[in-house]
Amino acid sequence: MKKLFLCFCLILLTACQSGLKINKDYQAVGQDSRVQYVVLHYTATDFNRSLYLLTKEPVSSHYLIEDQKGTIYQLVDEKNRAWHAGLSEWQGRTFLNSSSIGIEIVNEGFTEEAHGNIKWHPYSEAQIQSLILLLKDIKARYKLSAENILGHSDVAPLRKTDPGPLFPWRRLAKEGLAVWPNEQAVAAQKAVFDQQKLPDTGWVQEKLAIIGYAVPQTGLLDKPTVKVIKAFQMRYQPENVTGVVDSKTAALLVVVARKDFTTPK
């Protein structure tokens, strides 16, 4: 019995000695966080349905903000990848699920009314206040640029319209949580375009690509290009989401492409 006990101890000791050992005394300089972007969404349905879809179906987000009190629910740990952005691209980087945090905001999106009119649904003040607090926390922890806080329609303009034209990007910019074009520069550039022929479609496509949008470079005003123009307008010109470039759209493209951003008053 004593010999069996000694043999057992020897086997146990040998197993411990042969276990994996990793030295963590050194750290490489060449590394960064998985999280490079935040992508904002609306759920296009009510809270209960949103919660079900984001927890029981093969779609998810890291956070869900409900619509009454602005309660923030964490559904996926930030170290894990959530399935929220889908087929996506920004500034040449694709499949942003792997490099982003997704935030879903409970909102019906839009309702199609008679004669083809679209009614967009507003966000509650409680939701926006909660979102601002959450974004400030995420931005600080991951040292994110305000340029990398995006809408789903920015990264997937051919498929998505969220968070929509009623989303308060300008207000987020006041909090340092989004970029906003220099309004004086936009006004000056608009005055120039008011007096001359507007740029052609190839120019528009080039500016959109410089900003970060995945857009065809065909010189043709095709359906994909119109959708990308609408995505840009929803973000920076929500009063004119038509897919048609007017003098203000052109001015905004110039100012945003050259990254002439300011904090709005």
Q: Where are the predicted features?
A:
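Acidic, His- and aromatic-enriched active-site or binding-groove loops in soluble protein domains
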Residues: 64-65, 165-189
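C-terminal motif of bacterial Sec signal peptides marking the signal peptidase cleavage site
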Residues: 12-15
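Extracytoplasmic/secreted proteins, especially bacterial periplasmic and envelope-associated proteins
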Residues: 58, 67, 126, 130-137, ...
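Second-shell loop/turn segments in exported
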Residues: 89-92, 115-126, 156-159, 190-197, ...
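Positively charged n-region of N-terminal signal peptides that target proteins for export
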Residues: 1-4
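Active-site-adjacent loop/helix surface patches within enzyme catalytic domains
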Residues: 20-145
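Acidic/histidine-rich, metal-coordinating catalytic segments
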Residues: 144-159
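Short acidic, glycine/serine/threonine-rich helix-capping segments at coil-helix boundaries
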Residues: 193-256, 262-265
